[in-house]
Amino acid sequence: MKKITILFVSFVIILSCMSQENNNVNENNESTFKFSTWITANDNKSDKEYISEFKNYKQAGIDEILINTLTDPKLLNRLTILAKKEGLKVHAWIMAMNRPGDTIALKNPEWYAVSKEGKSCFDTRPYVDYYQWLCPNREESRNHILGLVEGLSKVEGIESVHLDYIRYSDVYLPIGLLPKYNLVQETELPEYDFCYCDVCVSKFEDIHNKNPMDSKNTSIDMEWKNFRLNSIRNIVNDAYAIVTKNEKKLTAAVFPYPEMADHMVRQRWDKWTIDEVYPMIYHGFYNEELNWIGYATKQGVDDVQDNMIINTGLYLPDFNSADELKQAIILAKENGAQGVAFYEGPGLTEEFKKVIIEAKQYLK
C-alpha cells in the first residue's frame, strides 16, 4: 500500500507540472498500457454520429473499443471501418452462453440450461428475465454459439472476438447485489445451480458412472464441479481454434480472478486457451474498497503467469471521483495488468476522460 501511495503522489505531481499542450494524447507515441471501453451498438445511429463518438473516445485516450452488435456481422463491419479510421482497434463483443432474445435459440426450447429444480431457462429465468442460458454440452446449442463466433471472426479488421457471459448462471451473486433481489445465499441453491439437462447428466454418467442427482451434496462433488468447469473451457478452446483459423484473437470478459470465478459462476479462466482476458473487477458489486482492485488483479496475473494478457475491467458508476479512478488505474498497472477497460463508454465523464489522458502520458 505504501508503494501505491508513493506512486500516486508522484503521479499527481508530474501531472500538475504538465503544460496544457501536453494534455492531448500523443498519437505518435503509443502507450504499451492500453485503455479500452465496452460499448453497445445501435443500428439506428448514423455514420456521422458514430464518427463523432469514436473521435471523442480517441481524443480521450481510448485505444480500443469492445462493441456489442448483437452478433450482427454486417453492423460490426460498418462500425469497424468507421472506428479504425479514427485510430481505434475493435473487438467483437458477444454474449455467449447467455443469449437473451436469440430468435434462433428461442425456437429450440431444448437448447436451454436446466436447473437442479428441473426448470429450464427457456421459460424460468434465474434472477432476471434476460438470463436465458444455453446448455454448453448439447451439440445444437454449442454449435449455435460457435457459429456466431465464427461469423464475427470473419469480419475484416477486428482484433478479436470478445466472449462475455462465457460461464454458467451465477451460483452466487456478488454480495453487493443480494439486497436488490432480497436474497440470502449462504449455500448453493437448486434454482441457481445449472445444468442438469438430460444431455449433461448423460455425458457425466458416461465419464464417471454416476448420476449427479443421486449425490447427497452436489456442491462438494468435485467430479460434477469439474465437469461443468470443463464444459465451459471446451467451448472456449473450440472458439479459440475458430478465431485463430480466421487470423483473429480470442478475448473474454471474466469474473474477478479464477478462484472467485470458479466459486461464483463455474468459470476457471486460468485453464483456458485464450489470448487476453478482461476480469470485471467491479469493487462496488462486492462491497470492497479500492485496494481490492489491486488484489484481484494480482491474483489473476499470478494464476495465469505468462499464458495470457490481463486487462482490468472497471465499472465507472463505482467511482465517486476522478481521483478514485486515477487510483484504480494505478492499482491495475502496479499489479500486472497490461491495460484497463471501462464499463461503459457513455459513462466516461469529462473528468474521467481527463484522468485517462493524463494516465496515458504517464503510464508508458
Feature map (PLM): residue ranges:
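Boundary/entry segment of secreted carbohydrate-active catalytic domains
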Residues: 25-51, 252-256, 316-317
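The substrate-binding groove and active-site-proximal loops of carbohydrate-active enzymes
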Residues: 39-43, 62-69, 127-143, 220-231, ...
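Catalytic domains of carbohydrate-active enzymes, especially glycoside hydrolases
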Residues: 48-71, 155-158, 271-277, 335-339
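Active-site-adjacent "subsite" loops/lids of carbohydrate-active enzymes
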Residues: 92-154
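Aromatic- and acidic-residue-enriched segments that line the glycan-binding/catalytic groove
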Residues: 99-127, 166-213
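Aromatic-lined carbohydrate-recognition surfaces of secreted/lumenal glycan-active proteins
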Residues: 162-169, 194-263, 308-318
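Substrate-binding cleft of secreted/luminal carbohydrate-active enzymes
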Residues: 274, 279-292, 296-299, 306-364
